[in-house]
Curated annotation (Swiss-Prot):
GO molecular function, one term: phosphoribosylanthranilate isomerase activity
PANTHER family assigned to the protein according to its UniProt record, in alphabetical order: N-(5'-PHOSPHORIBOSYL)ANTHRANILATE ISOMERASE
Reactions that this protein is recorded to catalyse: N-(5-phospho-beta-D-ribosyl)anthranilate = 1-(2-carboxyphenylamino)-1-deoxy-D-ribulose 5-phosphate
Domain of life: Bacteria
SUPFAM superfamilies linked to this entry: Ribulose-phoshate binding barrel
Biochemical pathway: Amino-acid biosynthesis; L-tryptophan biosynthesis; L-tryptophan from chorismate: step 3/5
UniProt-listed Enzyme Commission number(s): 5.3.1.24
Family listed: Belongs to the TrpF family.
Gene Ontology terms: biological process: L-tryptophan biosynthetic process
UniProt keyword list: Amino-acid biosynthesis, Aromatic amino acid biosynthesis, Isomerase, Tryptophan biosynthesis
InterPro entries referenced in this protein's UniProt entry, alphabetically: Aldolase_TIM, PRAI_dom, RibuloseP-bd_barrel, TrpF_fam
Protein name: N-(5'-phosphoribosyl)anthranilate isomerase
Ranges annotated as spanning the membrane: none
Length: 218
């Protein structure tokens, strides 16, 4: 199988950024919303100025943020992607699209109507992140959903020509099971952390197991 796009999210220190910058990830994510991994835009701008991230795109994660403020943050910090985890409507995203050149991804919870929701946002976004549905949480659940549904989401994203990332409960011990469903993208945060910090050891282990599966599948 083709190597999935890999996104490491929840970077919340300069050291986190340096560790993940040395990884094989394609995307690195910063959370600009209430979270234990929340970061200040000024810090992100400074960290990015001090760290080379060759071949990696930078993602800003937002929850119900003002559209103008989002566009301002990503431009100032030099980010490439806006990832929306709130109650944004299609009309909101259409407006945001007119304010930025960044890609826009919409995070959606796994559920019975997820494919329908994907179709409703398709005209205005560039990708989807599908995560577990956990009451009171906006992503970053650390809990997996039934990955038997992943092929449905892959089909829906391919029909619309959009990126797709699967999130929730992905770590070195579970990645082989997820890869059996051939996801085009994988998004994780806590699965590569030890004591709240990004772990070079866990990143290396996850990537080793991912590439082993990709090689065997081919």
């Amino acid at each position: 199988m083709k190597k999935p796009s890999l996104k490491y999210c929840g970077i919340h220190s300069l050291e986190d950024l340096k560790v993940t910058a040395r990884s094989k990830a394609d995307y690195l994510g910063f959370i600009f919303a209430e979270s234990k991994r929340s970061v200040d835009p000024a810090d992100v701008k400074r960290w990015c100025g001090e760290t080379d991230t060759p071949g990696k795109k930078l993602v800003g994660v937002f929850v119900n943020e003002n559209m103008s403020r989002m566009a301002e943050i990503v431009k100032d910090a030099g980010l490439d992607v806006i990832q929306l985890h709130g109650d944004e409507t299609a009309a909101d995203i259409k407006r945001l699209k007119s304010m930025t050149d960044c890609e826009i991804w919409k995070a959606l919870p796994h559920g019975n109507d997820t494919v329908q929701s994907m179709a409703s946002f398709a005209p205005y976004i560039d990708g989807y992140v599908i995560d577990s549905s956990v009451k009171g949480m906006r992503g970053g659940t650390g809990v997996s959903f039934s990955w038997d549904s992943v092929p449905l989401y892959i089909d829906a994203a391919q029909r619309e020509g959009k990126r797709l990332f699967i999130a929730g409960g992905v770590n070195p011990d579970t990645i082989a099971d997820l890869l059996k469903r051939r996801p085009p993208g994988i998004d994780l945060a806590s699965g590569i952390e030890e004591r709240g910090r990004k772990s070079e050891k866990l990143i290396s282990l996850l990537e080793e197991r991912m590439f082993e599966h990709v090689f065997i599948s081919e």
